[in-house]
C-alpha cells in the first residue's frame, strides 16, 4: 500500500494546551496523549479532557495505551473525547477493536517478524517503532527503514522511532509512509515540546510534496 500522498503528521506526547495549540496551528493532523504511567510524557485524563476541549474540531486525537484493560480504554475514550486508540503493548489481533474509534497498532520491529504478524492486525494503521527491550516507544531510536519500506508497500504504515526535523524528509522519501509520528525528536525535555522543532518537523515531513 505504498503512499504517494502527503504524509499525515502526528505529534505525540502532548501534555499541555500550549503545545497542543501550537502543533495544530503548524498543521499537525493528529495529537497523541500518553496514558502509560511509566512514561515521562504521561498525562492524566482530566488534563487531556481540558486540552481536547480547546482543540479545533477536525484534529485527530489519539490516546496511547499499553496493556490496559478494554474497559479502562473505553472509559478513557469517552471521558477525554478521543477519536483514535493507539495500542502500544502486547495486544493480540483480536484485542484491537474499539468501535467507533479507529485503532492504530504499534509494532516494534525486530528480527524474526514475518508478514503474518502484520497482516493479522485488522486495524486502521500499523505504527512501526524501534525495538528496545522493556520500552514502549519514546526512545529516540530509529527503526529499520528498509524493513519499514517493505511493510509500507503492503500496509498503511505510520513511521515512528527516532524521527526528528533533520531526518524526517529522508524517512518520507525512502519509506513513503501513510504518516509519521514524533515525540522526543521535537522536545526541549520529556513532556515539553520545542515550538521551533515542531514547526520545522511538520514542514520537512511534507517537503517532497
What are these regions (language model features)?
Residues 1-209:
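Conserved N-terminal beta1-alpha1 strand-loop-helix module at the mouth
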Amino acid at each position: 500500500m505504498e503512499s504517494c500522498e502527503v504524509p499525515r503528521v502526528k505529534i505525540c506526547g502532548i501534555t499541555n494546551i500550549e503545545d497542543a495549540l501550537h502543533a495544530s496551528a503548524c498543521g499537525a493532523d493528529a495529537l497523541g496523549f500518553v496514558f502509560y504511567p511509566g512514561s515521562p510524557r504521561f498525562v492524566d485524563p482530566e488534563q487531556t479532557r481540558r486540552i481536547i476541549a480547546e482543540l479545533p474540531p477536525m484534529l485527530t486525537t489519539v490516546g496511547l495505551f499499553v496493556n490496559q484493560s478494554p474497559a479502562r480504554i473505553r472509559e478513557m475514550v469517552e471521558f477525554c473525547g478521543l477519536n483514535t486508540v493507539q495500542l502500544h503493548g502486547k495486544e493480540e489481533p483480536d484485542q484491537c477493536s474499539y468501535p467507533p474509534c479507529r485503532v492504530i497498532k504499534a509494532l516494534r520491529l525486530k528480527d524474526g517478524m514475518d508478514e503474518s504478524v502484520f497482516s493479522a492486525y485488522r486495524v486502521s494503521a500499523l505504527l512501526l517503532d524501534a525495538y528496545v527491550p522493556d520500552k514502549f516507544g519514546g526512545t529516540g531510536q530509529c527503526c529499520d527503514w528498509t524493513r519499514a519500506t517493505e511493510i509500507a508497500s503492503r500496509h498503511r504504515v505510520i513511521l515512528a522511532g527516532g524521527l526528528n526535523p533533520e531526518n524526517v524528509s529522508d524517512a518520507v522519501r525512502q519509506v513513503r509512509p501513510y504518516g509519521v509520528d514524533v515525540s522526543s525528536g521535537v522536545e526541549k525535555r520529556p513532556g515539553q515540546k520545542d515550538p521551533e522543532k515542531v514547526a520545522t518537523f511538520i514542514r520537512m515531513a511534507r517537503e517532497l510534496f
